[in-house]
C-alpha cells in the first residue's frame, strides 16, 4: 500500500502531511543553532525561573535545556546553583563540570541521602560534575557502602561512567571518552572524508549469511581526529543484522594500516543460525549513505539527546544505561568512540550502535541498544 503524502524536504513517503521526523528534528536543530546571544540569555533566564519544569520534563524548559547544552554549551553556574537549591537532580547533565560550591552541595545531599533512589540520582549528578573531590566521594562510598547501596544494582564506580570516567580498585581515575566531538554531516558518497559509516565487504556472517559491513572506518591521521591518538586507521566490522542479537558486544582487532580480524561471536539464545532481516535494498542504503565528518567540532553533548545525529567523540545518546565494554585482552574499560543511529543510514531501523575501542590493544567493540 502506497502512502498518500511525502516529506516536502526529503521525499520520504508518509502517512501524514508535513515533514518527516528526521527533517523536523533537523529544522528544530538549525533554528536552535541560529539563536542570537540575546535569545540564549532569554532561554537561560526562563530556565532559571522555571527550573522545576525541567525536572518534570515540561516544555519549553526541557527542550531549551538540551538545546542550550547540546548546541551552545550554555548551562551556566547560575543555572546549576538554582537547580541545586531547588533540589532538581535530573537530568544529571545539568551539573556537568559545575563549580566547587555546587559540587559540595551535591556531596552534602548524597551523604545525607537515606534512600537508594535519591542516592542514585545524586551519584549521577556528581559523576557529571566529575572533579577529583567528586571522585574521592564516590570512591569512599564504594569502599564503605551506605545502607542504601543494597537497593542499587551497581557500584559507585559504575555511576561514575555516566560522566565519562571511572576509577579502579586502587582509586586511579580512568577516562572513558574524549573532550572533543565532531558530527557526521550529509555530504556525498564520493566526497573524501577521514570517517566513513558502513563500507561494504564481501565476507558473510556465520550466523545469518548476510553481508558483513565495516560500520566505521576512521583515519586518525586527519588533523580533526588527532585528539583520538590514533596514528592510522581504525576499522569496526560487524554484521548489521546480528549485532543486536549477540551475547555481548561484537569485537574485532584492527591494525593501523586498515587490517581487521573479526572475533567469534555467539547469539544471545545459543542458536547457531538466525534469519537475516536486512534486505539487499537496506544493504545498498546502508553502504551508500552520504555521511562525512563535519569540518568543525561541536559541543560535547551535541548528539546526546538526539535520535538523528551521528557523532565521533563527546557524549553518546544512550538509549538505556551508559555501558562501557571491558577489553577482552587487557581487562580495562574501553573508551567511547562514536555512535551510529541506525535510522539515519537505512529506513525503519531501530536503535543505536555504539563503537568503543581499547587504544592499547587495538580492539574495537560494537554494541546495540534500543527501546
How would you name each of these model-derived features?
Residues 4-15:
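Short Cys/His-rich zinc-binding micro-motifs
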Residues 1-2, 338:
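Extreme N-terminus of proteins, especially the signal/transit-peptide cleavage junction
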Residues 17-18, 26-371:
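Long compositionally biased, domain-poor regions of proteins
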Residues 2-4, 26:
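N-terminal targeting leader peptides, primarily classical Sec-type signal peptides for secretion
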Amino acid at each position: 500500500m502506497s502512502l498518500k503524502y511525502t516529506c516536502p524536504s526529503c521525499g520520504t513517503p508518509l502517512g501524514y502531511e508535513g515533514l518527516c521526523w528526521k527533517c523536523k528534528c533537523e529544522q528544530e536543530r538549525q533554528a536552535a543553532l541560529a539563536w542570537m546571544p540575546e535569545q540564549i540569555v532569554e532561554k537561560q533566564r526562563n530556565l532559571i525561573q522555571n527550573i522545576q519544569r525541567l525536572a518534570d520534563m515540561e516544555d519549553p524548559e526541557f527542550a531549551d535545556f538540551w538545546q542550550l547544552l547540546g548546541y551552545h554549551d550554555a548551562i551556566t553556574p547560575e543555572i546549576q546553583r538554582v537547580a541545586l537549591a531547588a533540589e532538581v537532580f535530573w537530568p544529571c547533565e545539568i551539573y556537568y563540570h559545575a563549580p566547587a560550591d555546587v559540587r559540595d552541595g551535591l556531596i552534602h545531599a548524597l551523604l545525607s541521602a537515606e534512600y537508594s533512589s535519591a542516592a542514585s540520582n545524586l551519584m549521577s549528578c556528581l559523576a557529571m560534575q566529575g572533579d577529583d573531590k567528586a571522585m574521592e566521594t564516590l570512591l569512599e562510598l564504594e569502599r564503605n557502602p551506605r545502607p542504601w547501596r543494597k537497593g542499587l544494582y551497581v557500584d559507585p564506580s559504575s555511576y561514575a561512567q555516566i560522566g565519562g570516567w571511572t576509577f579502579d580498585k586502587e582509586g586511579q581515575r580512568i577516562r572513558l571518552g574524549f573532550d572533543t566531538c565532531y558530527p557526521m554531516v550529509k555530504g556525498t558518497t564520493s566526497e573524501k572524508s577521514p570517517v566513513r559509516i558502513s563500507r561494504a565487504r564481501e565476507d558473510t556472517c556465520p550466523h545469518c549469511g548476510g553481508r558483513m559491513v565495516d560500520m566505521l572506518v576512521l583515519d586518525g591521521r586527519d588533523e580533526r581526529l588527532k585528539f583520538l591518538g590514533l596514528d592510522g586507521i581504525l576499522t569496526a566490522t560487524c554484521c548489521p543484522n546480528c549485532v543486536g542479537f549477540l551475547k555481548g558486544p561484537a569485537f574485532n582487532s584492527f591494525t593501523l594500516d586498515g587490517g581487521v580480524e573479526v572475533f567469534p561471536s555467539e547469539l544471545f539464545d545459543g542458536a547457531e543460525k538466525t534469519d537475516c532481516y536486512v534486505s539487499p535494498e537496506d544493504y545498498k542504503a546502508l553502504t551508500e549513505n552520504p555521511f562525512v565528518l563535519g569540518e568543525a567540532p561541536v559541543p560535547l553533548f551535541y548528539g546526546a539527546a538526539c535520535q538523528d545525529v551521528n557523532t565521533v567523540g563527546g557524549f553518546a545518546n544512550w538509549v538505556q544505561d551508559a555501558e562501557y565494554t571491558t577489553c577482552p585482552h587487557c581487562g580495562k574499560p574501553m573508551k567511547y568512540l562514536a555512535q551510529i543511529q541506525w535510522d539515519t543510514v537505512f529506513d525503519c531501523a531501530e536503535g543505536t550502535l555504539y563503537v568503543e575501542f581499547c587504544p592499547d590493544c587495538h580492539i574495537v567493540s560494537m554494541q546495540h541498544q534500543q527501546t
